[in-house]
């Protein structure tokens, strides 16, 4: 009954629905640490931890900031590489080469409509690693091809 009421509310309020799903996707798929520090939140005597650990767990701590930036760069590289895969390898991959993509898309859709936390979705994110690697390989091959064509044009 609650589900039916929620669906009805979403249907009657499309702006709210779009905002809800936008925020949900951002909090789950664009948070670069996948809540790895949030789930480590310390309840109790945090002063017992070494200063590095406190700095890592505390939002705004120097170690926390470094960790977040490194995770953000890595996440951006993986998403970017997966996009390059779509651009450069489109139509040249056998079906069995897409199994991780199917799992990722299935996980994305499942958590779009079900409970979601970054810590639940990191396993799907990791499915993008082979595509990111291949995507960067496709991009490098394309760049080399472009440079080779320019070099040939200068020699002629």
Language-model regions: role of each:
Residues 85-89, 103-118:
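Transmembrane-helix signature of polytopic, lipid-linked glycan biosynthesis machinery
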Residues 73-74, 117-137:
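Hydrophobic/aromatic-rich transmembrane helices and adjacent perimembrane loops
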Residues 79-83, 105, 132:
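Hydrophobic/aromatic residues in alpha-helical transmembrane segments
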Residues 102-104, 126-127:
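Active/binding-pocket-proximal capping segment
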Residues 1-23:
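Membrane-proximal low-complexity regions enriched in glycine and acidic/polar residues
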Residues 19-100:
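Membrane-interface anchor segments at the N-terminal boundary of transmembrane helices
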Residues 87-95, 132-156:
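Membrane-interface junctions at the ends of membrane-embedded or membrane-associated helices
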């Amino acid at each position: 009954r609650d589900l039916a009421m929620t669906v009805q509310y979403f249907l009657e309020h499309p702006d709210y629905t779009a905002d809800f799903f936008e925020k949900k996707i951002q909090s789950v798929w664009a948070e670069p640490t996948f809540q790895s520090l949030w789930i480590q939140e310390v309840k109790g005597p945090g002063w017992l931890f070494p200063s590095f650990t406190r700095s890592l767990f505390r939002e705004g701590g120097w170690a926390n900031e470094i960790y977040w930036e490194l995770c953000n760069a890595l996440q951006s590289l993986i998403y970017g590489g997966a996009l390059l895969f779509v651009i450069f390898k489109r139509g040249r991959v056998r079906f069995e080469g897409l199994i991780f993509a199917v799992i990722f898309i299935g996980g994305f859709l499942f958590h779009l409509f079900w409970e979601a936390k970054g810590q639940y979705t990191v396993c799907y994110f990791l499915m993008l690693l082979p595509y990111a690697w291949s995507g960067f390989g496709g991009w490098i091959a394309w760049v080399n091809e472009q440079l080779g064509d320019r070099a040939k044009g200068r020699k002629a």
